[in-house]
A protein has these predicted regions:
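Membrane-proximal basic amphipathic "stem/tether" segments
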Residues: 1-55, 235-241, 249, 254, ...
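Short alpha-helix boundary/capping and kink motifs at helix termini
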Residues: 9-16, 44, 48-55, 65-67, ...
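N-terminal accessory/pre-domain segments preceding catalytic cores
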Residues: 29-103
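Extended, charge-rich helix/loop segments that form flexible
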Residues: 69-138, 142-144
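Ordered hydrophobic segments in well-structured contexts
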Residues: 175-180, 198-199, 209-211
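A sequence-level detector for short glycine-anchored, His/Arg-bearing signature motifs
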Residues: 181-203, 288
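Short glycine-/polar-rich loops that comprise or flank the Walker A/P-loop
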Residues: 206
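Active-site or metal-binding loop neighborhoods of secreted/extracellular toxin and effector enzymes
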Residues: 210-285
């Protein structure tokens, strides 16, 4: 009984650490604007869709694998490259400030700070194993090792969820950062729970209950994250709910590293892109 009471207490503390919202799946995207919407394209959702069609398919035969092996994807160095992969000659790819992976105009730490193979080469850092030994498929796209991990773990999660989705038994929900345009339009960028969102979206869930972490709780969480960023490990409220109207106060704008116009181009990309434009540009089958 004592164990049960402790579990309930932990759950209550967790639920009080932010704001619960029931969010339409159509408004949820990942940290690189690969949407979970029905008309979008997300590489983890494609993984699950392909496995659902053929459970005997080999990893190397999947669009998921071929996507990360594509020469255009393997050449990604910056966030700008990845968001605007389909527009190689565009202004964002060639002019202005380049954001390392893991960084955004409004701040670093919602995505864990700067990381990546190219970042390590330029800055003399070591970020490959920030989230576990070779766990990050975007650290050096094309590395088979993290893709095998993602493949196996996502399939296990798929089977678990198809037996019943009871997130609070696990003690946590998907967590998101909200982007809010001046007109009130929103996008929810996943903070935690990307694989779960991929499975739920494929299974037809129209809405999902998610937690928007409070500034204090997300800062406490980040205190345990490994990072090589020189920024303080504190996430301010504007970085949990990122508002277009506050662009002049975003970290990289305020520090003079990028212009408000460039910052907003990246911000609006999360509303205007959904991933399908990039998989189409690469000439790969979307699967779903």
């Amino acid at each position: 009984m004592l164990r049960g009471l402790r579990a309930v207490a932990r759950l209550c503390r967790y639920l009080s650490s932010g704001t619960l919202k029931r969010i339409p799946m159509e408004l949820i995207t990942n940290e690189f604007a690969f949407s979970f919407a029905s008309d979008g394209w997300n590489y983890f959702r494609a993984l699950v869709a392909e496995y659902e069609k053929n459970s005997n398919i080999a990893l190397e035969d999947t669009t998921f694998f071929r996507f990360f092996q594509h020469e255009r994807v393997r050449s990604v160095r910056y966030l700008n490259d990845l968001l605007f992969l389909h527009d190689p000659n565009g202004r964002s790819r060639n002019d202005g400030y380049k954001f390392y992976l893991g960084t955004y105009p409004w701040g670093d730490h919602v995505a864990g700070g700067p990381w990546g193979h190219y970042y390590d080469q330029v800055e003399g850092k070591t970020t490959r194993d920030l989230y576990g030994y070779r766990r990050n498929p975007w650290y050096q796209p094309g590395d088979r090792y993290p893709l095998e991990i993602e493949w196996n773990e996502t399939i296990q999660l798929y089977h678990s969820i198809t037996r019943g989705y009871l997130p609070l038994r696990c003690g946590h929900l998907p967590e998101v950062t909200l982007l809010v345009r001046r007109n009130g339009e929103i996008r929810a960028i996943r903070y935690n729970g990307q694989h779960r969102l991929a499975v739920l979206s494929l299974l037809g869930y129209k809405k999902v209950t998610a937690l928007v972490p409070s500034a204090s709780s997300i800062s406490a969480d980040l205190a345990s994250w490994p990072t090589v960023s020189t920024l303080p490990k504190v996430v301010h409220q504007r970085e949990v709910v990122v508002r277009e109207a506050e662009v002049e106060d975003w970290y990289y704008v305020k520090e003079g590293l990028c212009t408000p116009e460039q910052a907003l181009e990246i911000f609006h990309a999360f509303f205007e892109l959904n991933g399908r434009e990039r998989i189409t540009y690469l000439g790969l089958p979307s699967v779903y």
